[in-house]
Amino acid sequence: MKLFNRKVTLVSLILMAVFQFFMALIIKRIVISAGTDENFIGYLSYTPSLNILLQALTIVIAATIVSMEFDKKTIKFLLIRPVKRQKVFWSKLITVVMVSFYLYLAYYILALLFGLLFFGTSVTAESKTLLVNTLALIGSNWLEAVMMGLFGLLCSSLFRNSAVAVVVSFVVLYGASTLVQLMKLFENKWGSFLLFANTDFTQYRSGETALFSGMTPLFSIGILIIHAIFFIVVGWWCFCKRDVRV
């Protein structure tokens, strides 16, 4: 796929490696200065706090994957091939999901490697519980990134301009995330139907309280499916049914 051959992909991987190195180094110095002990699982538990960087990369890639073809005037060359438009759209969608997965995989493999390098391999009973909770959080974060990617693909197909698609994606997605917190603050039950109220499945762990009363894991799965279908259908229609003008 062309996306994996773009310089931005290589640059992103290099930046992630550099970022993980300095993050591990800083946390190691903090641990030493505090006179405490830490292991690689403890370090790994810190890394999801910067999930916003991976989400941002996913949004940018998804929001430009179609619109970039219009910006570069290559969309007609893509569509004159003996392949139906819908197959091109599905290939773009699969690429977004795969790239998001590979970004997370690369990020956390690097986190694991630097965690082992700086903090060693010792594991305690508490560490195992922490690892399970961390993996659950990583899974929820990736699911949220995929949903953001689907919306970015919708914007990319709708606006057909990279700058507009990226800006709208960021404004709407992070605005919606803020709206969830506001509705939670005012205890508005309609907030439970918003996308970002349902992407964090760690809220259903034992001892945790759901964002809104009445929410269950099945409810959240249903809301996510509805949003995903809506994003995909609208994106598909914009890409497959509208006339191509460049």
From Swiss-Prot:
Does the keyword ATP-binding feature in the UniProt annotation? no
Keyword vocabulary terms for this entry: Cell membrane, Membrane, Transmembrane, Transmembrane helix
This protein's major location comes to: membrane
Q: How does it sit in the membrane?
A: Multi-pass membrane protein
What residues form the membrane-spanning segments? 7-27, 50-70, 99-119, 135-155, 163-183, 219-239
Which Gene Ontology terms of cellular component type are present? plasma membrane
Coiled-coil ranges per the record?
Answer: none
KW Transmembrane helix (keyword) present: yes
Q: Which Pfam families match?
A: ABC2_membrane_4 (PF12730)
Per UniProt, subcellular location reads as: Cell membrane
Q: What is this protein called?
A: Uncharacterized membrane protein YdbK
